[in-house]
Amino acid sequence: MIDKDGMAPWEICGMCHSADGISRMSKFPILAGQKATYLKSQMLDFRQGRRLNDGGQMSSIVTEVDPATIDGIVGYFAGLPGPLMNLVVQPGVDQVAYEAGRLLFEEGRSGAVACNVCHNDGHPAAPRLRAQHAAYLRKQLNDFKYERRVSEGATVMTSIAKLLTENEIDSISVYLHSSGSYDSDVAH
């Protein structure tokens, strides 16, 4: 149980995801600037027990959140500026993995549709992925692939992730983590 006295509703989430929505720990995804529709659907999936691929940690936390505050929490994180990263590939990034990930994300390959078909600003249900923690992305793709992440809308991702090799999952994760930034749904 979390002692919520004196806390704004979003501060409960900020304990792991950071007050600025840019978690410094790769286990916790960056929420700043994420699409509000996506954030709300994930909170509801955790709350209603439809998403369990984190060992139940989020379900137990989200059930402590007053349902009347969910829209405010979502609005807070969606309205924060997304992470800013240099559009130049950072030193130390595996260039081969980066380029392979870029090609998969932007062009796809035989049998696998390009990621950016859905993961772009025009598709409200698909999350923004650029600048997200590579380890988090890798885990989510593997959870889809091995059917550990099952929730509303997961069927499409499961079928796509099953087509990816471990090297491709790694490459996509490296590319997205290192490939830039995005703006939030709210103008700054």
Feature roles, as predicted:
Residues 1-10, 24-27, 79-109, 188:
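Electrostatic cytochrome c docking/interface patches
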Residues 3-6, 14, 18-50, 59-64, ...:
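Gly/Gly-Pro-rich "capping" loops immediately C-terminal to redox-active cysteine motifs
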Residues 9, 22-24, 54-55, 97, ...:
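N-terminal alpha-helical segment
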Residues 13-20, 73, 77, 101, ...:
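The canonical Cys-X-X-Cys-His
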Residues 19, 48-49, 79-83, 107-108, ...:
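Generic structural signal for alpha-helix termini and adjacent loop/cap motifs
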Residues 19, 57, 154, 177:
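Residue-level hotspots at or immediately adjacent to binding/recognition sites across diverse folds
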Residues 63-88, 160-188:
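C-terminal capping alpha-helices of c-type cytochrome domains
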